[in-house]
Amino acid sequence: MRVLHVCSELYPILKTGGLADVTAALPPALASFGVDSRVLVPGFPAFMNAIKDKQLLINIPSRFGAEEINIFLAKIPNTKIDIYVVDAPSLFARPGNPYADSSNQAYADNYLRFALLGWVAARISEGLDAKWKPEVVHSHDWHAGLVPAYIKASELASGKKAVKTVFTVHNLAYQGLFPMSVFAELDLPGIFLSMNGLEFYGQVSFMKAGLYFADKITTVSPTYAKEIQSYEQGCGLEGLLADRHNDLYGVLNGVDPQVWNPKKDTLIEANYSVTTANVGKAKCKTALQAMTGLAKKEDAVVFGIVTRLTEQKGLNLLIEAIGEITSRGGQVVLLGSGDKALEEAFLAAAKKSPKSIAVQIGYDEEQAHRIIAGSDVILVPSRFEPCGLTQLYGLTYGTLPLVHKVGGLADTVTDSSLENLADGTATGFVFDEFSVESLTLAIRRAFALYNRKADWKKVRKTAMQQKVDWNAAADKIHQIYSQLV
């Protein structure tokens, strides 16, 4: 089976969030099920620089405001997977963030940039590459939301059955919304600008295009698949998603064991397994404390946070509850960037308590590994969370997740309640209500369990034994493909 994945990010070449981890890990995981995957990405500088030995597949005349368009074919570095790169310098050759300028303002022509990506995917689905034609095109998030629309438009124009399409929602909150006036520049049939198409409350929605026109829809956890059919988390699309519930699947993301594996992670102070976690994690904690300037205290409970600093991630709760950690002798290590007010609030907390709170603004993949290995608890107090990868990394590294019971967090972490401790299923700490009080109680329970060393080690062992690799997810995705082909 031949499948084309369409996305805007791919780890380790370009990453702004978990999307990149998923698009990198899924194609090789699908290979074990006989799926021949290829990937299509925009020609952002990161891709153009990292991908070598590119072969020119075709030159396309000016389109979507791009003066020059070249489609290259190459291998993803250090893999056997083929990748198509859409090189359109006037649209993609911009420094920094792939979606926004240096002031963090979204590029005004993002609709053209990602329309081109979707349009090229449709051309590949029709045989643009004479040597390889996909049977399924799988697009990821709003950046690739127009892919099913362009493929459906081609089917309507030609009268020929098009390839099948799958669209994955990684985060429904980011919808790719643009003024209605841009539709005229998208080269789509006029009938697509309607309630049964791209129109969304007087705007054009790339996310809605994917949800409406794809043959199958997946999202990244079973709980999130249910939540997005409700008013609270449907972001205005709950009606469409409820109508399409028979085509909607929640498939939990996995962890790539080649990247996240405490037994062989070269980025951490000491490697360890389930049986050697006590010694290994102690070494990683000491190294983390030294690196971040925290007080060297073996018995301090270290809470790690690796996240975007946004209200969605529950950081407004954490800034209010952080005193609960430090007053009990705990320490906090935070890595992330985002909302300026939150950045300043955490920096101020670190300045006030430099031996208890360490904050690094920005994203550093190596430091993320060190924080997750060296912490005792990984905090993920998100208001909503489609899947979440950080808690899965925490489980893998024996760093107990403390999470809000929502989305994929609810599906992957089992609370250390008395009954769960008794039957050996506990893997972390879960709080139900999105409030400072509920988060604070969960923090107190983490301290209480840490003081019962035997129980802590038991929960850590259970956490590290959880199956969180990509095999189960790839199996389910392959089953969805098989329904279509």
Swiss-Prot record:
A molecular-function term among this protein's GO annotations: alpha-1,4-glucan glucosyltransferase (UDP-glucose donor) activity
Top-rank lineage group of the source organism: Bacteria
A GO CC term assigned to this protein in UniProt: cytosol
One Pfam family matching this protein: Glyco_transf_5
Keyword rRNA-binding on entry: no
Any GO BP: glycogen biosynthetic process
Keywords: Glycogen biosynthesis, Glycosyltransferase, Transferase
InterPro entries, alphabetized: Glyco_trans_1, GS/SS, Starch_synth_cat_dom
Alphabetical list of CDD domains matching this protein: GT5_Glycogen_synthase_DULL1-like
Reaction(s) catalysed (UniProt annotation): [(1->4)-alpha-D-glucosyl](n) + ADP-alpha-D-glucose = [(1->4)-alpha-D-glucosyl](n+1) + ADP + H(+)
Enzyme Commission designation: 2.4.1.21
The keyword rRNA processing is assigned to this record: no
Binding residues annotated for ADP-alpha-D-glucose, in chain numbering: 15
Record-linked HAMAP family: Glycogen_synth
Chain's role: Synthesizes alpha-1,4-glucan chains using ADP-glucose.
Name assigned to this protein: Glycogen synthase
Classification of source organism: Bacteria, Pseudomonadati, Pseudomonadota, Gammaproteobacteria, Thiotrichales
Originating gene: glgA
